[in-house]
């Protein structure tokens, strides 16, 4: 088995993945959302301190799953990029300690690659090559995944990420963090879903294949300020619905532009923000229109988790892509390349 560790942001997670058949044997996770909610976003120093507390607790649960028999573990895998430096280092320190004490090889995994492999948890075979939309609090990307060693970025955000924009809109409406499920519920509760959108679709007439949410976010801010004296629940629902609809339509329009160029046969959606049901439905319709197979990460594995890191590290294990402890380091940025 491979013991995998994830600590790139505000989720502490450990998992055990069986090498022979890619089955997830154990998966444990502690979310920090309640600790960061009062700040309206993740506080790096607080996240680091909580990882230092939570990772050892999760390791104890792993020990119970193994009946304290660590001989079943053949390698340690750790997310080392991209992410918050102060949280990545907490996971890396644990991984190094385990690798040294158990005399096991160390695998360094890219967090974005891990999200791609969230599509294949509990599956020995992958459906690569495929294209992937990754939407989360930190990223809005289209990736082309040819195989484990060839995953490249073909489109990214010029400013805020999709998930980050939901967090900021929720904060504008004084509704808390994380904003994704909060704004999604506002949209679901809105009673007039068929009216024309009140917010502009970003980059609608731009030839660039990219994402942008800052202009949409600013339009929401102006609407909130206009209604500030009477920002009741009905108005919040209206703003939430129209913002979500415009944000998703922007993803659809840009992805449609990509589809017309590349005509992918298989398209995946991953990342924490991919739990949004309206987004999933919109992409079902888009893929149907282009005769493209849609694959979705299971809801429980959309947000950051060690199971996806364990699954992706199986490929590295088979290729013996191990890293000496003295060369193991972290990076706040991904080293995945962009297509020219």
UniProtKB/Swiss-Prot annotation:
Pfam families: TsaD. Its main location: cytoplasm. Its EC number is 2.3.1.234. Substrate binds at residues 134-138, 167, 180, 276. Fe cation binds at residues 111, 115, 304. Its cofactor is Fe(2+). One of its GO terms (biological process) is tRNA threonylcarbamoyladenosine modification. One of its GO terms (molecular function) is iron ion binding. InterPro entries: ATPase_NBD, Gcp-like_dom, KAE1/TsaD, Peptidase_M22_CS, TsaD. It is found in: Cytoplasm. The keyword Secreted does not apply. Gene3D superfamilies: 3.30.420.40. It catalyses: L-threonylcarbamoyladenylate + adenosine(37) in tRNA = N(6)-L-threonylcarbamoyladenosine(37) in tRNA + AMP + H(+). The keyword Electron transport does not apply. SUPFAM superfamilies: Actin-like ATPase domain (SSF53067). GO terms for cellular component: cytoplasm. Binds 1 Fe(2+) ion per subunit. Keywords: Acyltransferase, Cytoplasm, Iron, Metal-binding, Transferase, tRNA processing. Belongs to the KAE1 / TsaD family. Required for the formation of a threonylcarbamoyl group on adenosine at position 37 (t(6)A37) in tRNAs that read codons beginning with adenine. Is involved in the transfer of the threonylcarbamoyl moiety of threonylcarbamoyl-AMP (TC-AMP) to the N6 group of A37, together with TsaE and TsaB. TsaD likely plays a direct catalytic role in this reaction. This is tRNA N6-adenosine threonylcarbamoyltransferase.
């Amino acid at each position: 088995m491979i013991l995998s560790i994830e600590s790139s942001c505000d989720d502490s997670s450990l998992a055990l993945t069986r090498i022979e058949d890619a089955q997830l044997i154990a998966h444990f996770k502690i979310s920090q959302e309640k600790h960061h909610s009062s700040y309206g976003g993740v506080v790096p120093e607080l996240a680091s301190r909580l990882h230092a507390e939570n990772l050892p607790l999760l390791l104890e649960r792993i020990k119970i799953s193994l009946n304290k028999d660590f001989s079943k573990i053949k390698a340690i895998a750790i997310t080392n990029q991209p992410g918050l430096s102060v949280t990545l280092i907490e996971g890396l320190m644990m991984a190094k300690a385990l690798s040294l004490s158990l005399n096991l090889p160390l695998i360094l995994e890219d967090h974005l690659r891990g999200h791609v492999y969230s599509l294949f948890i509990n599956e020995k075979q992958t459906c690569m090559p495929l294209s992937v939309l990754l939407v989360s609090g930190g990223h809005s990307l289209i990736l082309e995944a040819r195989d484990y060693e060839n995953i490249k970025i073909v489109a990214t955000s010029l400013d805020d990420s999709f998930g980050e924009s939901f967090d900021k809109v929720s904060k504008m409406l004084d509704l808390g963090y994380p904003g994704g499920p909060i704004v999604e519920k506002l949209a679901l509760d809105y009673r007039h879903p068929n009216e024309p959108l009140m917010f502009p679709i970003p980059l609608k007439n731009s030839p660039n294949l990219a994402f942008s949410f800052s202009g949409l976010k600013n339009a929401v801010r102006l609407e909130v300020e206009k209604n500030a004296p009477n920002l009741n629940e009905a108005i919040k629902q209206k703003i939430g619905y129209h913002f979500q609809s415009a944000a998703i339509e922007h993803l659809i329009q840009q992805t449609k532009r990509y589809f017309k160029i590349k005509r992918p046969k298989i398209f995946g959606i991953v990342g924490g923000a991919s739990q949004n049901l309206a987004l999933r439905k919109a992409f079902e319709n888009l893929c149907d229109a282009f005769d493209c197979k849609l694959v979705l990460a299971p809801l429980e594995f959309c947000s950051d988790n060690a199971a996806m890191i364990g699954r992706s590290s199986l490929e590295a294990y088979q290729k013996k892509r191990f890293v000496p402890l003295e060369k193991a380091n972290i990076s706040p940025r991904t080293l995945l390349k962009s297509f020219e």
